[in-house]
């Protein structure tokens, strides 16, 4: 490896110093321009090897790296992955909820319309749903969950793999009450129970049947 593209060079430098690793660090984060990524690609094409490191999680999973990997693929550059910590799978495993099928939704938008549309699209999703959330937005998000999804079971995973790791398992309404009396701290992974499965005949009412009576069926000779 010739250089390291880091989300925060200060954070990565502490890790490198801890293990006495001497490598050039360059900044590559969520606000980096396309020009920055193209510069990295250019250096790799010139014969150098690079690593991508993020501060607290797996690169590309709600962290920088996705665009860079895409550019590498388009340029025919081989990309190797070193499996690292992923809060998504860790939180799912410890949630106590269904782990066979799940959907990771990342951070919800702060735009009210986009946020509402996103949550509405998930209302009937039967898979376990996983979200990331910041502490100052937690109660608002829990209230939105109650509004759009009802009072489902939820696992609130805080500061996973860190000193103050905590996992709370309760219902959404219980979580709202808890955090109205306990100040949220740290980064959260929210694992929400999926919607109940409905039989395909559910909702096929007499009104539905009548609505089809005007249709003319084709005649087969």
Region spans (language model):
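Class I SAM-dependent methyltransferase SAM-binding "motif I" and its flanking Rossmann-like core
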Residues: 67-125
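Anionic-ligand binding region
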Residues: 116-118, 138-180
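Class I S-adenosyl-L-methionine
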Residues: 1-80, 90
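Generic beta-sheet signal
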Residues: 47-54, 102, 127-131, 188
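Short glycine-rich anion-binding loops that position phosphate/pyrophosphate groups of nucleotides
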Residues: 55-59, 135-137, 195-197
């Amino acid at each position: 490896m010739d250089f390291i593209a880091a989300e925060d060079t200060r954070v990565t430098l502490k890790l490198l110093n801890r293990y006495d690793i001497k490598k050039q660090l360059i900044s590559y984060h969520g606000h980096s321009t396309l020009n920055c990524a193209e510069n990295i690609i250019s250096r790799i094409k010139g014969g150098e090897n690079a690593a991508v490191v993020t501060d607290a999680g797996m690169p590309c999973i709600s962290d920088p790296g996705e665009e860079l990997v895409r550019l590498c693929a388009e340029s025919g550059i081989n990309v190797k992955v070193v499996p690292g910590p992923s809060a998504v799978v860790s939180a799912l495993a410890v949630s106590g909820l269904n782990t066979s099928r799940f959907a990771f939704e990342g951070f919800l938008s702060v735009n009210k319309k986009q946020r509402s549309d996103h949550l509405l699209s998930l209302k009937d999703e039967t898979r376990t749903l996983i979200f990331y959330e910041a502490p100052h937005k937690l109660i608002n998000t829990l209230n939105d969950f109650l509004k759009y999804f009802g009072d489902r079971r939820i696992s609130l995973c805080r500061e996973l793999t860190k000193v103050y790791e905590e996992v709370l398992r309760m219902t959404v309404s219980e979580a709202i009450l808890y955090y109205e009396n306990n100040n949220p701290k740290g980064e959260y992974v929210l694992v929400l129970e999926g919607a109940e499965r409905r039989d395909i005949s559910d909702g096929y009412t007499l009104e539905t049947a009548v609505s089809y009576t005007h249709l003319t069926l084709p005649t087969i000779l």
